């Protein structure tokens, strides 16, 4: 069985600056792995190369046996990979559950708000009903169902992180990359986020790779 993620000899240079040098590791299916290190050590650059946002200088990155460099961004997602970013991209004028039903901010125009609102009208179709059910299920997995109808502008930083993670699960990824999911979050809530993530991994069998400072 191929690993969920296989990184071999990854190298990334910016001009004459070596940002990532000969990095190799694997993430098996159902495994929870962390890349830990201080600012400037190349964690985010590694993440960006894995998710196809940066073109690597050398090496190989495979997601479930498929070379990332041969895939378009939409094909990478279809291969099973989804990522979050350090700074959440939530629609602050929407509720938590509405955010779960639409793509991240800045990917579409403002009319996406009208689309999100329409999902709650009586004539929504069965496909949209299924997405709504999955959105509530994801909030249950992260133990935040009580926040479903709160505006995201009312959430704390840690709560926003949880909502962003929940939205990333809507596409049913097999490999989830989390960029500093507890950055700036107080200790008790940070531990809650990690515990909820571990429970989610156990329940769904997905693979998770995170980067953090410690």
Can you describe what each PLM-predicted range is?
Residues 151-155:
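Conserved ABC ATPase signature
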Residues 172:
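Conserved catalytic motifs of ABC-family nucleotide-binding domains
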Residues 36-38:
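The feature captures the beta-strand-to-loop junction immediately N-terminal to the Walker
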Residues 112-147, 195-199:
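Conserved ABC ATPase "signature" region
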Residues 51:
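Helix-to-loop junction immediately C-terminal to a conserved catalytic motif
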Residues 59-66, 78-79:
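Conserved ABC transporter NBD signature motif
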Residues 176-180:
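Catalytic Walker B motif of ABC-type/P-loop ATPase nucleotide-binding domains
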């Amino acid at each position: 069985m191929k690993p969920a993620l296989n990184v071999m000899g990854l190298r990334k240079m910016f001009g004459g600056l070596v940002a990532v040098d000969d990095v190799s590791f694997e993430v098996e299916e159902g495994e929870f792995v962390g890349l830990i290190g201080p600012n400037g050590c190349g964690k985010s650059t590694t993440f960006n190369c894995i998710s196809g946002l940066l073109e690597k200088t050398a090496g190989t990155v495979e997601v479930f046996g498929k070379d990332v460099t041969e895939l378009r961004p939409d094909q990478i997602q279809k291969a099973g990979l989804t990522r979050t970013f350090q700074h959440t991209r939530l629609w602050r004028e929407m509720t938590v559950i509405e955010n779960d039903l639409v793509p991240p901010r800045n990917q579409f125009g403002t009319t996406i708000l009208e689309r999100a609102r329409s999902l709650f009208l009586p004539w929504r179709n069965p496909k949209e009903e299924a997405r709504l059910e999955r959105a509530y299920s994801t909030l249950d997995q992260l133990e935040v169902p009580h926040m479903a109808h709160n505006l995201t502008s009312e959430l704390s930083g840690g709560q926003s992180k949880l909502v962003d993670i929940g939205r990333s699960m809507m596409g049913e990824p097999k490999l989830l990359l989390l960029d500093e999911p507890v950055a700036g979050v107080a200790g008790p809530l940070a531990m809650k986020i990690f515990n909820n993530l571990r429970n989610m991994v156990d329940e769904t069998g997905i693979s998770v790779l995170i980067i953090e400072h410690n």
